[in-house]
Amino acid sequence: MKTSKIIIASLVSLTLVSNPILTFAATNDVIDSTTEITTDKEISSTQPTIKTTLKAGQTQSFNDWFPDDNFASEVAAAFEMQATDTISEEQLATLTSLDCHNSSIADMTGIEKLTGLTKLICTYNNITTLDLSQNTNLTYLACDSNKLTNLDVTPLTKLTYLNCDTNKLTKIDVSQNPLLTYLNCARNTLTEIDVSHNTQLTELDCHLNKKITKLDVTPQTQLTTLDCSFNKITALDVSQNKLLNRLNCDTNNITKLDLNQNIQLTFLNCSSNKLTEIDVTPLTQLTYFDCSVNPLTELDVSTLSKLTTLHCIQTDLLEIDLTHNTQLIYFQAEGCRKIKELDVTHNTQLYLLDCQAAGITELDLSQNPKLVYLYLNNTELTKLDVSHNTKLKSLSCVNAHIQDFSSVGKIPVLNNNLDAEGQTITMPKETLTNNSLTIAVSPDLLDQFGNPMNIEPGDGGVYDQATNTITWENLSTDNPAVTYTFTSENGAIVGTVTTPFEAPQPIKGEDVTVHYLDDKGEKLAADEVLSGNLDDPYTSSAKDIPDYTLTTTPDNATGTFTTTSQSVTYVYTKNIVAAEPVTVNYVDDTGKTLAPSETLNGNVGDTYNATAKQIDGYTLSTTPNNATGTFNTSSQTVTYVYTKNIVAAEPVTVNYVDDTGKTLAPSETLNGNVGDTYNATAKQIDGYTLSAEPTNATGQFTSSAQTVNYIYTKNPAPEKGVVEIHYVDENNKQLSSATKISGTVGDNYTTEPKNIDGYTLTTTPDNATGTFNTSSQTVTYVYTKNIVAAEPVTVNYVDANGKTLAPSETLNGTIGDTYNATAKQIDGYTLSAEPTNATGQFTNSAQTVNYIYTKNTNIDQPLPDKKTTKPSNLKTTEVKKASDTLPKTGDSTPWKSALLGVFLSSTALVIWKKKK
C-alpha cells in the first residue's frame, strides 16, 4: 500500500512538471478557496506555487528594472518585496496603483514597464523628466512638487485627475484628456492654459503662474472650483459656470466681473484687481467674500445674509452697510480712509474687526459680545468703549486720538494685550497773555484702570501736580503750539496733547488817506488808503504824474496810525508844453467831406472843445466821444458824421425769364432811397443758362420804378457715358462681380479696387481714372493670390491603442494647397483602414492624419522557458490575477507531455488494482 502511494505521487508530480498549465489551474483552485495570507508560515507554503506562475520572458531584480534605487524600493514595496528580489516584466505590468511620494526619487526610468498603472502618486521628489507614454491606463496622476520642465499627458486619454502643481512647466497640453474632472497646474510658469477640450472639469487650479493673460472656462459647465489667482488675466467670463461654488481670481488685472449666473458661489476672492464695480447681490449663498485692493467706490452686500467673512481692505468705498449681515464673523476694512461711519450693532457674531487706517471717528461696540480681536490703528477715533466686549483677547489702537481707556480695565485679559501707543490729541487754540500760557491738563486722560496718566510737559513747560496745570513762559508765535505727553503706568498707552496758540489780536488804527492834487485843488490821481494797527508806523509816497511836477511834500508823509483818521496831500504844478493840434472833420457815413475841417491848438494838459456844424440836406448822426478832451503830445482827430436826409425811391423789379418771356423763377423787388445804389443778381436755374447780363443790373434808385430782366436759354439734354470695372487674377479669372458707373460725357470718373480675401492687387490700370465719353469703357484690376504658409500636417502610424509603430511624418505647404499622406509598410502589422483625411488641403490650423494598424497573428509560438524563478513575495490576490491569464491564441501546448502523464497514471492504476 505504501509503495502504491509512492508510485501514484511520483506519477502525479511527473504529470504536473510535464504540464505547467495543469499546475497553473491547480494554483487557481487553491487561491479561490483561500482568504488573505496573514502568517509567515502561510506565505512560505505558497512560495513554490507563486514561483511557478512567473511567465516566460525577462526576469530581473527591481534594482535592474529601475536604475533609481529609491524608485526601485518603492515599486518593490508595492509588491511587498525587496528591491533585490527578482520579478518578470509581465508581473510588473500587473501593478495598478503606486504611491512613491516624498521618496527622494530623481529618476523614474522603468515606469514604462508598469503599463497596468491606473493611479500614480510621485509627489515631493526631485524628478526632472517623466515619460508616461506607455502608461496609457492612468486615470489618476499626481506629480506635483518636483522639478519637471516638460510633461506630456497626451497619451493618457483616460486621465480624470491631474496634479502637476509646483514644477517648472512652461506649457501643458490637455487637449487629449477629455475625461479630466480635476486639473491643478498651479505654481509653474505657464503663459497660457487651453482647457477647451476638457468639458468635464469640476475643479481647475492654475494660480501663481504669474504669466497667464487669458483664460476661457466657458466650456466647463460642470466647474465647481476655479483658482486662477496671481496671474495677469484681464478678463474672465464665468457666465457659463452656473455650478461654480468657489472662485479665487485675486491678484490679476481684471476690470469687470459679471457673477449674475453664479448664484451657487459660497467663496469669492477677487481682491487685487482693477474692478471699479461689482454686483454680488445675486450671490445669496456667499459666506466668504474678499474684494480688497480694488478701486471700488460702492458695494452692496445687503442680500448676503449668510456672509461670515468680508474683506474690503484698501478700497475707495465711501460707506459700507453691514446691517443685513447678521452672521458676519470676520470683517476687515483696513485702509478705507473714505469710510467715516461704521455700524456693527447688528453683527452680534463678530469675532474679528479690523478697521485700521479707516476714516471712522466713532464706533459702537456694545452689541458685539463675541468680539475677540479688535484692530483700530491709525483711525480718527476719539472715544473707545469696550466694556461690553468681555471676550476680547487683543486690542490695538495705535495712532488714534483716544484719551479715556478706562473701559479696557473691565476685561482683565486685555491688560497685557493692549497696544495704544502714538495717541495724538489736539486741543482748541489758546491766546497768549504777556507771551505766557497756562492750560489745564485734560481730565479725560485715564488709563485702563481709570487712573490719571503720567504727564510730561514739552517745550519747557512746568507741570503743577496740585492744580493739574502746565505753564509756559516766553513763548513766540514762530512756533505757535505747545505739547505735553501722557503715559500709562505699564507703558501700553502713550500719547501727545498739542495746544495751538496765537498772540493777542492787535487794535486796528484809523486809515490814512493820501491825496494827489494840482495847485488849484483838482485831483490828478486816485487816492491811496493806508491801513494798520494802532501805533504801527506808516509811510506814504508821491506818484509820478505825466506833465506835472511835485511842488509840495507834506510834513505828515510818514507817521503812526492813531485813533483818528488822517490825510496826507501831495501838491503838483502843471508843466507848460505846446501840444499837437486837434483836427475836427465833418463827413457823411461814407467818409465824404461835407464841410471844411477845423484845427484846435493849445498846451499839453489843456482842455479842448470841438463843435458840430449845420450842413444843408444833412443831419448829424454821430457825435464823437472825443469831442471834448485834453491836448497832448500826439495829434488827435475829432470826426462828426452826418447822414443824408432820406427820400424813399420807387422799387426796382428783377425778373427771371426765358427768351419767350416765360417766368422761370419768382421776381425780386429791390427798395432804397433816391440816390442809393442797387445791385441786381442772377439766379442759378436748373436746366437753363443765362443768355446775357442786363445793362441795368447795377444802377441808382430814382423817383421812377425800374425793371431789370435776366433772360435764360434752355440747356440741351446731356449725353451719358458708361465705365465697366472688372476684378480678375493674372489668368483673367473673375474674382469678384464687375461693377458699372455712369456719368455725363465729359465729366471725370474715378474707380477703386476691391479688397479681395486671399489676394493682393498687383496691377492698377492706367485708365483707373478718366473722362466719360460716348463709347463704353472697361477698367480691369489684376490681383495675385497671396502665398501664406500653412500649419503642418502630422502623419502618425499607430496601433489601436495609440502606440507609435513608426516615426511620424510632417507635411508642409501653403494654405489652399493639396496634401497627400501615404501609409507605411510596418513589419508584423496590417493597415486597418485608410484615414478619411489622408488627402486634403493645408489650412491655418495644424492637422493630424492617423494610420491605424492591427498586429498580425502568429500561429507558431516558441515553447515557454522552463527555467525556474526565485520565489515571489506577491500577495495571494495578485498571484491570482496573474494566473487568470489564459494562453493566447496560437500559443503551443505541451500535449505530448500531457498524454504521457495520463498514460503513465492509467498504467499505474491498473497495476495497483491487480496487486490488490
Curated annotation (Swiss-Prot):
GO CC terms of this entry: extracellular region
Membrane topology: Peptidoglycan-anchor
GO molecular function: signaling adaptor activity
MucBP domain: residues covered: 506-568, 576-638, 646-708, 717-779, 787-849
Annotated localization: Secreted, Cell wall
Signal peptide: 1-25
Motif LPXTG sorting signal, residue range(s) on this chain: 886-890
Chief subcellular location: secreted
Keyword entries, A-Z: Cell adhesion, Cell wall, Leucine-rich repeat, Peptidoglycan-anchor, Repeat, Secreted, Signal, Virulence
Coiled coil stretches, renumbered: none
PROSITE patterns: GRAM_POS_ANCHORING (PS50847)
Pfam families tied to this protein: InlJ_IG (PF22508), Int_EF-hand (PF22350), MucBP (PF06458)
Source species, domain of life: Bacteria
Chain residue ranges for the region called Disordered: 862-888
Keyword Nucleotide-binding tagged: no
Cited SUPFAM superfamilies: L domain-like
Propeptide: 890-916
LRR repeat feature ranges: 94-115, 116-136, 137-157, 158-179, 180-200, 201-221, 222-243, 244-263, 264-284, 285-306, 316-325, 338-357, 359-368, 380-402
GO BP of this protein: cell adhesion
Pentaglycyl murein peptidoglycan amidated threonine modifications at: 889
Similarity field: Belongs to the internalin family.
Entries under NCBIfam families matching the protein: LPXTG_anchor
Function description: Involved in several steps of L.monocytogenes infection, probably improves adhesin to host cells.
Name of the protein in its database record: Internalin J
